[in-house]
UniProtKB/Swiss-Prot annotation:
<keyword id="KW-0028">Amino-acid biosynthesis</keyword>
<comment type="similarity">
    <text>Belongs to the class-II pyridoxal-phosphate-dependent aminotransferase family. Histidinol-phosphate aminotransferase subfamily.</text>
</comment>
<dbReference type="GO" id="GO:0030170">
    <property type="term" value="F:pyridoxal phosphate binding"/>
</dbReference>
<dbReference type="InterPro" id="IPR050106">
    <property type="entry name" value="HistidinolP_aminotransfase"/>
</dbReference>
<keyword id="KW-0808">Transferase</keyword>
<dbReference type="InterPro" id="IPR004839">
    <property type="entry name" value="Aminotransferase_I/II_large"/>
</dbReference>
<dbReference type="InterPro" id="IPR005861">
    <property type="entry name" value="HisP_aminotrans"/>
</dbReference>
<keyword id="KW-0663">Pyridoxal phosphate</keyword>
<keyword id="KW-0368">Histidine biosynthesis</keyword>
<dbReference type="InterPro" id="IPR015424">
    <property type="entry name" value="PyrdxlP-dep_Trfase"/>
</dbReference>
<dbReference type="InterPro" id="IPR015422">
    <property type="entry name" value="PyrdxlP-dep_Trfase_small"/>
</dbReference>
<keyword id="KW-0032">Aminotransferase</keyword>
<dbReference type="GO" id="GO:0000105">
    <property type="term" value="P:L-histidine biosynthetic process"/>
</dbReference>
<dbReference type="Pfam" id="PF00155">
    <property type="entry name" value="Aminotran_1_2"/>
</dbReference>
<dbReference type="InterPro" id="IPR015421">
    <property type="entry name" value="PyrdxlP-dep_Trfase_major"/>
</dbReference>
<comment type="subunit">
    <text>Homodimer.</text>
</comment>
<protein>
    <recommendedName>
        <fullName>Histidinol-phosphate aminotransferase</fullName>
        <ecNumber>2.6.1.9</ecNumber>
    </recommendedName>
</protein>
Length: 353
């Protein structure tokens, strides 16, 4: 029973808890399988020792980091906001548009669960519009839902998670013309190499989210950023928490951009491994495989229960994510992928291929 001074609607929500299996191959969180190089970790340790006074708050407006992000993305510094992971920026965008009964949040589902979760924790109405059978977006259906439900912010992951597919240019152009804030979440940009950044100057209602948690290997540091026209960026600065990004996280993100030629050099291997897993899974008639432009694959068992398959793979040491009636499989190291392939082969008999 909830205490009387707590919001009763929170009683139905579940706290987010990630599973912990230290001995298993972690292919369930879309992290890059490679840690930072040892020399870069040593550099961060040196920067922590020389440049961070732990008794002082971190820089509240990290101008150097914003300038580095702006240079990387081809925008100006006043178009950049940084956050404690993209989650904080999603929360700030909802706060800036919908709080106090002023509007509804929308997205096309299945998709990244935090759009819904963060709206619900803020007591903001959320509408999830169903994707098509192949997980595309029906612009007519989405536009009608936006118009009929008082939507003020529309979140679209591009590529989408858990399905890995990109929106077409035509869909982006059409949805960008809607009279709402349109947020394109490009968390996997470095793998897809598709970005709507050039549209920022044409569409003042467009916001792009990105992260250092995936291709840049900094998931532990929780650094996300938003790109938007300066007016929207200025509002996001008003609603963010003070000192929201720890000093070491700022240094890590700056160093990652400084050495991006080294860190991003791992991406061709990840994409090659993704294609290798795709070729293997395509041989199984009982598995429906979907095209991906990210560092993961989405597969849907045609007959077997997806949760039973997930549990069986976990029992064999390969952790994958159950989602949307299927399985999301992160591309790991070649050795991890070898074990995944062997584990899948062990679960499906030859006649099921």
């Amino acid at each position: 029973m909830m205490q009387p001074y707590l919001r009763p609607d929170l009683d139905r929500l579940q706290a987010y808890h990630a599973p912990h299996f230290p001995e298993a191959d972690k292919l369930d969180a879309n992290e890059l399988p490679h840690d930072l190089p040892e020399w870069l970790k040593n550099k961060l340790a040196f920067l922590l020792e020389q440049g961070v006074r732990t008794n002082r708050y971190p820089e509240g407006d990290p101008l150097a980091l914003k300038a580095a992000i702006a240079e990387y993305c081809g925008v100006t510094s006043e178009m950049v906001c940084v956050g404690n992971g993209s989650d904080e920026l999603i929360r700030s965008l909802i706060t800036a548009t919908c709080l106090g009964g002023r509007g509804t949040v929308a997205s096309a589902e299945p998709t990244f669960s935090m759009y819904r979760i963060l709206a619900e924790t803020l007591a903001v109405p959320y509408i999830g519009v169903a994707r098509t059978a192949n997980y595309g977006v029906d612009a007519d259906v989405l536009e009608a839902a936006v118009g009929a439900n008082g939507v003020r912010v529309l979140f679209l992951a591009n590529p989408n998670s858990p399905t890995g597919n990109l929106l077409s240019d035509e869909i982006i152009e059409r949805l960008g013309s809607l009279p709402v804030l349109v947020v394109l979440d490009e968390a996997y940009y470095e793998f897809s190499r598709f970005s709507a950044v050039p549209l920022l100057w044409e569409r003042p209602n467009l916001v792009i989210l990105r992260t250092f948690s995936k291709a840049f290997r900094l998931a532990n540091f929780r650094v996300g950023y938003a790109l938007a026209n300066p007016e929207i960026a200025a509002v996001l600065e008003k609603v963010r928490l003070p000192y929201n990004l720890p000093g070491l996280s700022q240094l890590a993100a700056f160093a990652a951009l400084e050495h991006r030629d080294v860190l991003l050099a791992a991406i061709p291997e990840i994409l090659a491994e993704r294609r290798r897993i795709e070729r293997f899974l395509a041989d199984f008639e009982q598995l429906e495989l979907f095209p991906s432009d990210a560092n993961f694959l989405f597969v849907r068992p045609r007959i077997a229960d997806p949760e039973a398959v997930r549990v069986a793979l976990a029992g064999r040491g390969s952790l994958v994510r159950g989602a949307a009636g299927g399985l999301r499989v992160t591309v790991g190291t070649p050795e991890q992928n070898d074990r995944l392939i062997a584990n899948v082969a062990a679960l499906f008999t030859p006649e099921m291929r």
